[in-house]
Amino acid sequence: TDNVVNVSSDLRNLRMIKTSVELAQIKESAEIHTEVYKRIPSLYIKGMTDLELQIEIEREMRLHGSIGIFRSFGENMDIFMGSLLAGDNAQAASPFDYALGGEGISPILPLGANGSILKSGTTIMIDMAGNYRPYMDDMSRTFSIEQAPDTAYFAHEISIKIHNSIKSFAKPGTSCSDIYNTALEIVKENNLEAYFMGTGQQAKFIGHGVGLEINEPPVFTPRSKETLVAGMAIALEPK
């Protein structure tokens, strides 16, 4: 037993920095995932439920090569290939540290779509794991059924502003906590604190690493001690 050493933290640190081959796999997966997402509007049929739309998206993902598994780092978590949240269901609290949870279709798994009919004015957030290669991507996109409320459009524009702001200064050596705090400052400037990263339950992060799993380190939190390093692959998702 004297020769047994726990190297879990060393492996986590090693996996944070991707090789060129690993980055290429993430890029390929994201490119396929993008093509699937482009098809989402054509998958919608008037009168269908959120669950029915999610099933159609999952089918499209499988046809494009997804292995159909959502692998998440550091949590004993059950989920499908991702999450589709529509309307008020997005405000249902999650048992996990998520910005948006959803009731699900059963207490067995209180997460995600709950069978709500997609009506005019409903906003839909689709957050799915692109598992088309051994190294995954994580992609969130927002849609609306016909016309969305003005508040939703405004919040979406602020989300894009946060993305662009962080992209303008994030580089090797940038503190992950500074990235979170920059996002929060923009949110406060636009009086959206009540909606930032959830309503009933607000998550305390705006992004994370991706690789063999979703939610790998680094994680962008107010107290994160990590800094960006060349070769990291991250999902930036202020909501």
Located regions from the model:
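Active-site neighborhoods and metal-handling regions in enzymes and metal-associated proteins
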Residues: 1-239
